[in-house]
């Protein structure tokens, strides 16, 4: 029951976090933990900022042994999580995160591409640990979901 409550609070926080970044309606993308980060959950809300896209992340955790303060690298790749392509946009001008009271980490980034372009194409979002924490992909989420795009 406690885990369900934590999950509910996590999703509510992620949704509200995305709403504060833009007056336009955002798109929520679930982040799936990789094998190196089993048991963790995450979400990113994409907001339309005109010619840019704002991204508000919330993740429940990182692999044990990750260096603190937690630094994460984020990328928008061409392709899907199952069939990844090259990096289309690296969002690493800052890599810091903020520890949340409800057992998780929040951070935000921006990409120099319109949200409509991301929704129309086949792109995925990758969250990677810092080099001193193994430089491993810990989450991935496909931007184009059922009902969106073609």
Where are these regions (language model features)?
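Sec-dependent bacterial lipoprotein signal peptides
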Residues: 1-19
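N-terminal leader/targeting pre-sequences
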Residues: 19-150
């Amino acid at each position: 029951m406690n885990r369900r409550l934590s999950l509910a609070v996590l999703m509510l926080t992620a949704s509200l976090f995305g709403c504060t970044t833009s007056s336009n309606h955002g798109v929520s993308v679930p982040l799936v933990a990789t094998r190196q980060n089993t048991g963790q959950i995450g979400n990113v809300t994409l907001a339309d900022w005109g010619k840019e896209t704002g991204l508000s992340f919330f993740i429940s955790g990182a692999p044990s042994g990750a260096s603190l303060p937690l630094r994460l690298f984020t990328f928008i790749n061409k392709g899907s999580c199952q069939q990844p392509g090259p990096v289309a946009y690296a969002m690493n001008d800052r890599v810091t995160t903020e520890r949340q009271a409800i057992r998780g980490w929040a951070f935000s980034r921006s990409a120099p591409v319109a949200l409509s372009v991301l929704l129309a194409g086949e792109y995925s979002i990758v969250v990677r640990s810092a080099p001193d924490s193994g430089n491993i992909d810990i989450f991935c989420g496909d931007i184009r979901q059922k009902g969106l795009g073609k």
